[in-house]
Amino acid sequence: MSSEKMPIETLQADEHRFAIILGAGAAGIIQGCTFIREKTLPLEEFQILERQSAFGGVWWKNTYPGAACDIPSHEYQISFALNPYWSRTFAPQPEIQKYFEDVALQYELHKSTTFNTEIVEAKWDDSRLLWLVETTDLTTGDTKLWSCHVLIGALGAFTVPKKAPVKNVDAFKGEEWHSVDWPKNANLKGKTVAVIGTGPSACQFIPNIYPEVKSLIVYQRSPGHVLPRNDVVVGSLTKWMFAHIPFLMRFNRWFWMKKDEILRPRLFTVGSWLQKIVISMTRNHLYKQIKDDTLRRKLESKDVFGCKRPLMLSDYYPIFNNDNVELVTDSVTELTENGIKSRNTDTGEEMERETDVLIWGTGYNPVDFGLPVPTKGRSGQLLCDKYQPELFSLYGVAVDDFPNYFNFLGPNSSSFETSVMELFELQAHHNSIATEYLFQKNVGTFRYAIMPKEERVRSWTLSLRPGQAKLPPANPNCKSYYRSKIGHVYRYPYPYWQYKALIAKLDFKRDWVLLQQRIGQKEVKVLEF
């Protein structure tokens, strides 16, 4: 089948499921498990479509040296699938990927998952009140058209890698890659290596590649706040106790999450007593590991705490004490065939440094919500364009003009206060409630869909703006992916119990409209609840 000659809405689907989940990472796995646990849908009624060849999402894809969780393992796990056997306080990438894969297999999600599948386009078909999803099999090149009532975007925020906006970005002739595409056969032994970017991923792999390289050049735009990692091996006695006395494991997780719930709002309040203490800790950590005053000035963050994601690393700073490591704080301006040009912002002097290997540690584009899958709503507008530039959404899970569409980690839903795993579980439950309603409603001679009210989407988002303006990333000097393209902070700013209460149930009368269509007819009625 080929959809190149005609619009996909004119074609008949090859496969139909009631719900399709895009992505088999943590969010997609939690959504599938929630469907099963809450008896929303049986396995045969939903399908997970995944580009990679295994479960795990970013934890399958990111295999760079030193890849690990920067959140303690006992917090970075699913509440209904606690793992008593974490090896360390901060588990490494292979262990985390296996954990998510094991959870997926436990709930038999492999029976409803199609791997090696590129989503070409997802489009709402108003003539049938269905989503149409075109895919390509990456192993055979075959295309397929799926249809579904409910479409759930579980692709996460860290799927679209970015590079620095520099001149002649494709000019470099040496070896080059982004941290997310780390080659399995990468050989850095005896080579000069340049790293552009000092975000969370770069700060993890830099200490791990240093022993191999001849020399290392690190280009830093602005330093972040760094705290000691305090990563320790979990003892066999602790593992035994967690495995055989599950209450202790649950209490341990509850204790640390409750601590975060109490302390994090204060930590991310600008000028708070706790923030001042933690900033002092970051300075002491830097001064203990770096003795050179010039290096200290380069590595000490000038940002308000919380502008960027704080880092927890104990092996990062010492790398810069070595003679064969150069920290460059000039602005990268251009790539050449043999290296990188940068300009000193004070003197205007430009300098080229040659390198054998260039590694991009510049992270992702989390603010480009709706990417990388082209997803079109009722009007034909792309989801990524619908969100921009104001980032309006309903609770970060839905948006007007996109019926029966739900996603994870959308605008204005993440918070400094809580773990992303808890957020995924909250949003999966919300999506499950909506799906159950639609599953029960779509029987008989009518089809139904639900869609957020435009005025509610706007009013809820705008109600967050006063609180968001007080968050650390709102500082005018802060350059952060926590801000939209026009400067709005898109994190939830208020006590998180309020968000939990909002998303725990669906208020159909306040938030939603009902689309109704008699099967076989094209007229769609928009009804109030």
UniProtKB/Swiss-Prot annotation:
Positions contributing to NADP(+) binding: A68, C69, D70, T198, G199, P200, S201, A202, C203, Q204, R221, S222
The record's free-text note on cofactor binding: Binds 1 FAD per subunit.
Cofactor dependence: FAD
Upregulation: Expression of the botcinic acid clusters genes BOA1-13 and BOA17 is coregulated by BCG1 during both in vitro and in planta growth.
Binding site for FAD: V58, W59, W60, K61, D70, I71, Y76
Assigned keywords, A-Z: FAD, Flavoprotein, Monooxygenase, NADP, Oxidoreductase, Virulence
Primary enzyme class: oxidoreductase
The protein's annotated pathway: Polyketide biosynthesis
GO molecular function terms listed in the Swiss-Prot or TrEMBL record: flavin adenine dinucleotide binding; N,N-dimethylaniline monooxygenase activity; NADP binding
Pfam families per the UniProt record, alphabetical: FMO-like
Enzyme Commission designation: 1.14.13.-
Gene3D superfamilies assigned: FAD/NAD(P)-binding domain
PANTHER family: FLAVIN-BINDING MONOOXYGENASE-RELATED (PTHR42877:SF7), L-ORNITHINE N(5)-MONOOXYGENASE-RELATED (PTHR42877)
Family: Belongs to the FAD-binding monooxygenase family.
Function noted in UniProt: FAD-binding monooxygenase; part of the gene cluster A that mediates the biosynthesis of botcinic acid and its botcinin derivatives, acetate-derived polyketides that contribute to virulence when combined with the sesquiterpene botrydial. Botcinic acid and its derivatives have been shown to induce chlorosis and necrosis during host plant infection, but also have antifungal activities. Two polyketide synthases, BOA6 and BOA9, are involved in the biosynthesis of botcinins.
Protein name in UniProt: FAD-binding monooxygenase BOA2
